[in-house]
């Protein structure tokens, strides 16, 4: 008989990276809602992104990670507010610029996260 040892590899989820990925997905949903002029989806997605911003803040505070770059949730919420203002004032340029800014914030945060932790 051969005795084989089974080892279980437990992958630890990087919650911050997971939140960033969810946020990027929601930003895509936000774009789709705007393109299809669906305000119900827009506000649902808007709320989801807001919640993810606060959730990420909580994760950074729990982890006490000084190396993780993240724009504060208030900065992200301000950006969302600017998107909302652009929508209601029919300012497509402002809306697109602010969505791009929001996307850049999340991508920058993702790049600063250690993918192995």
What are these regions (language model features)?
Residues 1-10:
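Short Lys/Arg-rich cationic patches that frequently serve as NLS/NoLS or arginine-rich RNA/DNA-binding motifs
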């Amino acid at each position: 008989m051969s005795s084989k040892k089974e080892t279980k590899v437990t992958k630890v989820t990087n919650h911050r990276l997971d939140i960033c990925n969810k946020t990027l997905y929601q930003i895509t949903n936000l774009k789709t809602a705007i393109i299809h002029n669906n305000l119900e989806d827009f506000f649902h997605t808007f709320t989801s992104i807001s919640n993810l911003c606060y959730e990420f803040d909580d994760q950074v505070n729990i982890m006490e990670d000084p190396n993780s770059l993240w724009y504060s949730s208030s900065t992200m919420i301000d950006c969302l507010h600017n998107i909302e203002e652009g929508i209601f004032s029919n300012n497509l340029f402002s809306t697109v610029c602010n969505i791009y800014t929001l996307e850049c914030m999340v991508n920058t945060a993702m790049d600063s996260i250690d993918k192995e932790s």
